[in-house]
Amino acid sequence: ASSPEVLMTEVTRDTMVERNNGAPREILSEAQVIDQRRPTEIDLGDRSLIVVPRRGHTDSDISIEISDPSVVFCGDLVWNAMFPNYVDAIPSRLSQAVRLMRRREPTTYVPGHGPLADDAAMGLYIDLLDHVEGASRRALDRGMTAEEAGTEYTLPTGLEDWTLFNPGYFARAIGAWMSELEGA
């Protein structure tokens, strides 16, 4: 029996080896490394899919996109009905990646966390990302720390019922934005 073909970006492979002592090094060394700068088409026989490097939540983000029916597997770039974890995020890239995934035609989005999303849900998520950016900019202008701003932060109207796994996520998100904005 043949083994499955493993595809991954170089960043993903390196991260797996670096962060996981039990990583299956034999499999990782045999994995086909896909281009991190441009989409890769994978022919599945009766259809194909596109693997698109996205970067944002982490440097190794990808989306997997199918055209008929229109489906986008978003990974951790999208947390539907949940406040995202910005632990390794570069916020401007996260926002850009999510906007670029959004399609003009009706699409089912499969997030890394939360229920399936449609265009309206993606719009709410983008609004949330923008809201966090705005709160971060205001906090910087006021000379606040990320922790102070995180304590003060509230979800936008209409999203109050979104799940928050960790109350520290607000400060983490604002801190990620502050780091990026101060480095600019």
Regions picked out by a protein language model, each given a short descriptive name:
Residues 1-41:
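Active-site HxH/HxHxD metal-binding segment of metal-dependent hydrolases
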Residues 11, 56-58, 183-184:
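Amphipathic, soluble alpha/beta structural segments
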Residues 41, 48-138:
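Metallo-beta-lactamase
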Residues 20-21, 80, 85, 166:
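Detector for Asparagine
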Residues 20-37, 61-71, 109, 160-164:
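Short, charge-rich amphipathic segments
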Residues 15, 103-105, 116-184:
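Accessory terminal helices/loops
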Residues 2-3, 30, 45-47, 67-69:
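Short coil/turn connectors at secondary-structure junctions
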